[in-house]
Amino acid sequence: MDIILVSGSAGLIGSESVRFFCDRGYTVVGIDNNMRKFFFGEDASTDWNRDQLIQEYGDRYIHHSIDIRDQEAITNIFKTYNKDIDLIIHTAAQPSHDWAASDPFMDFTVNANGTLVLLENTRQICPEATFIFCSTNKVYGDNPNFLPFVEQELRWEIAETHSYWSGIDETMGIDSCKHSLFGASKVAADILVQEYGHYFG
């Protein structure tokens, strides 16, 4: 059985990933403990979205309300589905710049350590699975602010003659620029994912 595992499954990108694969007949295992409510208050709760996914997809969506930093609980999920896990889509994160500044340990452990927990379980239990990490433009710090922008009718665009006109990729540097604490924790996670790919395939 092909299993898709999605962290942050009740959030915006995670829930769209769940819908995409459930609509195509896959079984999706979702991990989301609604930390948005903790970070931003009751109005930011994703419980409604989780409940909608459960109602909409029934047995095709299996939800686990687990913190991605909980190594034992995450390992138990990975061991339950073992090599049936074909794809991991990691969208879970601590997304608040204000929270990162007020509690840098929480920010770093969710974004970097939580990513490491998922990577290591993938390596140990389902090494053939594909791992997709959803990062953020904040890993580039303030570097994008110095690109040549052209004012359009509705927004600013990068000049068509620039190499990043069709999108910014990993060739943009992340050093020697200003980062937020949130951006720094996501850089750590980003580099972990890249290095796991280099070391372990």
Annotate each PLM feature.
Residues 1-201:
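N-terminal Rossmann-like NAD(P)+-binding domain of SDR-like oxidoreductases, especially those catalyzing
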